[in-house]
Design a protein with these regions (language model features):
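Membrane-interfacial terminal anchoring regions of lipid-handling membrane enzymes
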Residues: 1-10, 17-211
Length: 211
């Protein structure tokens, strides 16, 4: 109603909460929800919404230490949030230093795009549309030196050194990474790998989508 009749713009998250591991993926349930308005015409249900995927990238990921710790603890047991943790994370996400922030308004999802999936049953249709949105979001992601530094460290390479980052930028990232040492965990190398993944996974996603 707000979009098709009142002509208003509406921002909708691609999933319940921002990903913690750097692998952004659209929840198929969101696509299913969009289709409820016109069950008899799944193409028009989405095309008339004029969906424009938005890609947001940060130089410094918000709450990166906390995300890494939560993922680390979730490997062996269900992570139980402390009282007030959600509010604290929201406030930290708003106020913490993010460095360079870049927003890309990606190509709109058109009726022509959707027609490619017209013959698919509901579940497959939702999955393919979600993948299309992910493809455009990843293509619009602005990678920063931190992403390439983390990728090189994680995989023991120097693939991006020089072209994508300088020694000074790497030293700054290593200083940030060193703060992980204050967390007392049984497997610090696993925690570090998870932390590096938060920054390096977008590199794999972007390169996969662009090749």
């Amino acid at each position: 109603h707000a979009i098709t009749e009142k002509g208003e713009s509406v921002w909708i998250a691609q999933r319940n909460g921002r990903t913690k591991d750097g692998n952004d993926a659209t929840d198929q349930g969101i696509i299913k929800m969009f289709g409820i308005s016109k069950r008899e015409d799944k193409i028009k249900a989405l095309s008339e919404l004029n969906i424009v995927p938005l890609s947001i990238s940060y130089e410094w990921e918000t709450c990166d230490y906390m995300k890494a710790l939560e993922l680390y603890q979730s490997r062996s047991e269900k992570y139980v949030k402390k009282r007030g943790e959600d509010l604290s994370s929201i406030l930290s996400g708003i106020t913490s230093f993010k460095g360079d922030v870049h927003l890309t308004f990606c190509p709109m999802i058109t009726e022509q795009d959707l027609m490619a999936y017209d013959s698919l049953p509901g579940i497959e249709y939702n999955r393919e549309v979600a993948k299309l949105m992910d493809c455009r979001i990843h293509a619009g992601y602005r990678l920063t030196p931190n992403n390439f530094i983390a990728h090189d460290i994680r995989f023991g390479k120097h693939e991006f050194k020089g072209d994508r980052y300088t020694d000074e930028q790497k030293d700054r990232f290593l200083h940030h990474l060193k703060k992980l040492e204050k967390y007392d965990v049984d497997e610090p190398e696993v925690l570090m790998d998870i932390f590096l993944g938060i920054y390096s996974n977008p590199v794999d996603n972007c390169f996969e989508r662009n090749h």
